[in-house]
Amino acid sequence: MSRIPVKMSAVLLTGHGGFERLRYREDVDVPSAAAGKVLIKVLAAGVNNTDINTRTAWYSKSVTGETSTGGAEGFETADDDDGSWSGTPLAFPRIQGADCCGEIVAVGEGVDDNRIGERVLVRTMQQAAVDYQPFKCWTVGSECDGGFAQYMLAYSAEAFKVESDWSDIELASIPCAYSTAENLLERANVTSGETVFITGASGGVGSAAVQLAKRRGAVVIAQTSKEKVAEVRSIGATQVVTREQKLTDTVGTESVDVVIDLVAGNAFPDLLELLKTGGRYAASGAIAGPIVELDVRTLYLKDLTLIGCTFQEQKVFENLIGYIERNEIKPLVAKSYPLKDIVQAQQDFLAKKYVGKLVLVPPQH
């Protein structure tokens, strides 16, 4: 095993704002493995909406627009005091990166030395840091440093060994997007034979949700742009509709059991109309805007259940590792980039001209 260096390359987020807040450095201190933690050599790290949303402080209630509108330059109205997952100010500089596939190279006190050499995925929505309290989480790349570096620290309990012939880049596409998607389906209690409508189906979470819903035996109706219809159908959607089509006409009112929504915005009222009486709506994103119009009569007269999904039960990530190892899901990587090209990767992410995930690769020396 190679010697652990003193310094490493990393991308530092120096504050909320635009791309200018991302600084690629080659002189960042390599962290030491503290008690209960492991030092991981990062082999690859995926790009996610949350990385951009955290950078721009989109999570602040002072921001009401689409995620993409401030993706390049940030939001002038953003309040730094509540711009994180936890609703508390971030500590800067912060190393972002919600996804990490890596190799354990050192362990802290109380961690078995035999873990050294394991290839692992780091759980994005961590629980060890908050003592496994329900509905509390510690997000990688937000409340603690993440994978946009050559090395990162993680609680040993949050670094899940994975045995698979997938590449590092393919594995790095999994933690944030697939756990978010699996959690949405789990919280909505999607079962075999049910019809599920998925918005934003070409993105990382949406494409994962299509696969994972299909794995559960659901009938999947997916929404995407007209350019991506064939690709979304190829990963398991039974029916694909485009954003230009009127949902209530194309899909039909009272026609689906569950809506998995990553988009929100102006389409929200129509999504509720698609649901059968007693249907479930689960959300974990609002890329088209967080402020929606709700006719409360639709909610109560149809006996709908609205579910917000952030916190994940322990079994969600454990199940994902099993799906990978049994080849029950497949990775969907559109492109990879050197870590130093993070701005280009995020520009391509915001352009949304691909299906699946974009992945960054740190220097491997």
Regions found by a protein language model. Name each.
Residues 29-45, 60-126:
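Glycine-rich beta-strand-centered segment in the early N-terminal region that forms part
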Residues 136-137, 143, 224, 266-332, ...:
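Glycine-rich phosphate-binding loop and adjacent beta-alpha segment
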Residues 207:
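Residues forming the Rossmann-fold NAD(P)(H) cofactor-binding site
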Residues 2-6, 183, 314-365:
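C-terminal hydrophobic helical "lid"/dimerization subdomain
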Residues 195-198, 214-270:
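Adenosine-nucleotide cofactor-binding segment
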Residues 202, 210:
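N-terminal Rossmann NAD(P)H-binding glycine-rich loop of SDR-like oxidoreductase domains
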Residues 75-95, 122-200:
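NAD(P)H dinucleotide-binding glycine-rich loop of Rossmann-like/cofactor-binding domains
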